[in-house]
Every structure is written in C-alpha cells, then in structure tokens.
Amino acid sequence: MNLAAMDPTTYDVQLEAKCVKLKQLFADFDTPELETFSSEPAHYRMRAEFRVWHEGEDLYYYMFDKELNSKVRCDQFLPASELINKMMPALVELLKPNTILRHRLFQIDFLSTLSGEILVSLLYHKQLDSEWEQQAKILKQTLSTQFNVNLIGRARKQKIIFDKDFVVESLNVAGKQLQYHQIENSFTQPNGKVSVKMLEWAIDITKNSSGDLLELYCGNGNFSIALAQNFERVLATELAKPSVESAQYNIKVNQVENLQIIRMSAEDFTEAMAKKRSFRRLEGIDLDSYNCNTIFVDPPRAGLDADTVKLVQGYERIVYISCNPNTLIDNLAELSKTHKITRFALFDQFPYTDHMESGVFLEKK
C-alpha cells in the first residue's frame, strides 16, 4: 500500500485519471458514456487489517508501504471508517499495559458498519487459555462503554467469540432499508457508501425487467436481495459456506420471499444447466421452471471461464460487475459478439489505488 498517495486534496484528480484509463482500456468496444460513482475521499473503508509491533512497553499498529519498502506506524488510518479510527487508540491503550492480552499478539482486524457496529479480531502466535479469556472479557466490557463492539480471539485452530462473530449493516438503498449480515473473515464490500451506489445502479438498470434473475457468485446476497424487487423470482449461487449462511440470514431479516440460494460453484451450476451432470444440492429445485431472462455476475479477479461465458451468452440481459477490467475485457471479446453494451460504469471502491471496479449492462443484439 502506498500511504503517501492517500491525500484527499488529490482525490478528484486521481479519480479523473482512472476514468481516462478505463475509457482507454475499453476503446475497442462500442460503450456508452461512462457513469462515474465517486467515493468519500477519507474514511471510506469499513474494514482494515493491521500488524502489531512490540517495542519495549510500546505497542502500535503498522502497515507495510510497498513504495518505501518498509513498515509504517499507523496510529490513525485515513481510509478506514471514523469508527475504526476512534477504536484504534482506545483499544491499543488498553492492550499496552495488559501483559496477557498483548503477549504474542501479531495482528488486529476491524470490521465496522455505517450503522455503528464494530467487530475487533485479535490474532495470536500462541494458544489462548482461560486466563486470556478472562482478560478478553474485561476488555470487551470496557470497550462496550464507548462502542457497540464484539471481540474475537484467534490462534492456530482456535476462535473464541465475545459475543458475536458478525456485524449487521443497515443500508438505505433507493429509499429502502436493507440489512446485511457480515461475518468476520469473509468477503464483504469494503466501501459501504460506494456499495450503496452499486446496488442503486443495478436496481436502476434492471427496473423494467421481466421474468426471473439468475445470479452467479452471490456472496452474502448483497445484490440478489436488493434486486429481488425487480423480478418475479431470483435464483443465486455461491460456493463459500459462511457466505451462504449469511445470505440465508439476510433473506430472512429482509423478508425476501422470491429468492433461492444454492451452495455450488458457478462452474458446477453451468454443468447442471447444460444437463452434463446432476447434483444432489439441486434436488427439489426445478431449474426448468425458472424463466431467467437476466443474469448477474460478479466474478473473482480471474473473470468468467469459457463455459460460463457461453452460459451467460444465452440470456437476454447481462449485468457484469468486475473487480478486474482486464478479465472483463477478455470476457467482452466473446460477449460483445452476441450482446451490446448499453450501460457502463466506474465505481471507485478503492481510492488512491490503481484498482478499478466497473460495471456493464449488456443486451442481446
């Protein structure tokens, strides 16, 4: 991470440079005008991870700066939410004099929400015993006088929870309040306010849809739950068990009645749709009963494999959210043969980095 680049006064210039670069990357495609969704210039990250440095009686957070090729002390961290920045000094001042809690502590992770919850994970190079548990309970109680906080202790093959290992985010999305269960150590959108903009963009481009929606790589149901209002039914797949459990929680708490989550990979689902294989996880689910005219994909950085690209091409409308414009371009080389890009967006999830989160909406030619 290049900490020196994190200067809010240069944010607009850096964002404009990303827009120019993204347009250049997509120059070979017939794209509409780029829609740009900016981030807050500071305190935009809802999660952060720090290593812990021990120096005599002192103890502090640090990160590794790739530009300087050295560790940098982080008493505060500009990208992190205001809640994380408030927690950082409060926590470290309680850890410093506590020989039990600080011993062999090497990392601290924070997961916060816009709605005011924070989860703190303490990672150790030692086994956690009853003495540690007693001190951790006191730490949690003390922090709870100032914060809506939960605490986790982690060591090799150990995970001790006080009192929850998740937070519940509450987001106002297009005038509707949505709640999202976000579990520790699993994927969540890092930039809460930009995540809302992504959801609202996806709702807008699918608002006149008919039939059903298929989503691959649905995670904790982030998009499926928000988009369910635009479709008769939604069928979504996700492989990671914690994410599927979070998605089921989110379906229930948001009272979404037309969304079905299947725990399987996109690759396996592609084979199931092509009737190449049968899967026990699909027992009781009649895939042929779904009338999915729209497909939503938010794949990992590697993009879609060739078979999944062929599957996706079978749908009238494609919503593709990408965390890697290069693999999106690779996929568009095929998708653009059958579909036309009608919406094109940049979501600045990660200010002050080269990372570009983009979205395209494609409709069959």
Curated annotation (Swiss-Prot):
One of its GO terms (cellular component) is cytosol. The keyword Methyltransferase applies. It holds the Pfam family tRNA_U5-meth_tr. GO terms for molecular function: rRNA binding; tRNA (uracil(54)-C5)-methyltransferase activity, S-adenosyl methionine-dependent; tRNA binding. It catalyses: uridine(54) in tRNA + S-adenosyl-L-methionine = 5-methyluridine(54) in tRNA + S-adenosyl-L-homocysteine + H(+); uridine(341) in tmRNA + S-adenosyl-L-methionine = 5-methyluridine(341) in tmRNA + S-adenosyl-L-homocysteine + H(+). SUPFAM superfamilies: S-adenosyl-L-methionine-dependent methyltransferases (SSF53335). Its EC number is 2.1.1.-, 2.1.1.35. GO terms for biological process: tRNA methylation. Keywords: Methyltransferase, S-adenosyl-L-methionine, Transferase, tRNA processing. InterPro entries: MeTrfase_TrmA_AS, MeTrfase_TrmA_CS, SAM-dependent_MTases_sf, TrmA_MeTrfase, U5_MeTrfase_fam. S-adenosyl-L-methionine binds at Q189, Y217, N222, E238, D298. The active site is at C323, E357. HAMAP family: RNA_methyltr_TrmA (MF_01011). Dual-specificity methyltransferase that catalyzes the formation of 5-methyluridine at position 54 (m5U54) in all tRNAs, and that of position 341 (m5U341) in tmRNA (transfer-mRNA). Belongs to the class I-like SAM-binding methyltransferase superfamily. RNA M5U methyltransferase family. TrmA subfamily. This is tRNA/tmRNA (uracil-C(5))-methyltransferase. The gene is trmA.
